[in-house]
């Protein structure tokens, strides 16, 4: 943040103007990391225990969500590499839950992993056949990864909030572009990511009594 301010919002080397959006994303990421630490109750005494592992996985998930949001907002695309990263951290979360969750339901997790794997293979096959990614399949995979980290209630709230945001945005666009055709497709993954971040923050704030 300070470097952005001191350099006048320009790259240190090429002097190209840097969009304030990236600085906002960095600030929001930092806030999310702090809220995560407070929600988990991590401190210097327990950072090397299972809480440290939980925090590390949470950080990796936050980065994943922000990557999805940033790319989809710019290009309306869910990058396959980012999805694979999300699946990888889901596998790590699976190992963590298996070892540390008392009410761990292995059947539920296995079903989600199998469905995610099938959808990933289907999406990869379509890319090879048409050279185009399937946005809808990628959205479903994204939702499954969300469910892996925020469970069913968090996923349901995320989807409801996403639909609400898209509806409000569409209504505003219709009012602004009254009498004109507006066919631009919304970046659904971006809104899912934003909604999930809001739901996720609310869950952790409730845990620390805010």
Where are these regions (language model features)?
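A membrane-topology feature that recognizes alpha-helical transmembrane segments
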Residues: 1-210
């Amino acid at each position: 943040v300070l470097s952005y301010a001191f350099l006048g919002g320009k790259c240190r080397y090429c002097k190209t103007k840097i969009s304030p959006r990236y600085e906002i994303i960095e600030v929001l990421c930092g806030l999310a990391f702090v809220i995560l630490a407070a929600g988990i109750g991590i401190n210097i005494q327990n950072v090397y225990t299972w809480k440290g592992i939980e925090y590390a996985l949470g950080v990796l998930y936050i980065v994943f969500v922000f990557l999805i949001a940033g790319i989809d907002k710019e290009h309306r695309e869910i990058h396959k590499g980012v999805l694979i990263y999300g699946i990888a951290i889901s596998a790590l979360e699976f190992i963590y839950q298996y070892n540390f969750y008392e009410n761990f339901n292995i059947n539920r997790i296995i079903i989600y992993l199998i469905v995610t794997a099938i959808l990933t293979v289907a999406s990869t096959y379509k890319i090879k056949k048409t050279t185009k990614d399937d946005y809808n399949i990628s959205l479903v995979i994204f939702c499954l990864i969300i469910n892996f980290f925020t469970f069913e209630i968090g996923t349901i709230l995320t989807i409801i909030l996403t639909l609400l945001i898209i509806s409000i945005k569409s209504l505003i666009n219709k009012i602004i572009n009254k009498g004109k055709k507006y066919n631009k497709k919304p970046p659904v993954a971006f809104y899912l990511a934003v909604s999930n971040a809001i739901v996720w923050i609310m869950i952790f704030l409730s845990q620390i009594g805010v």
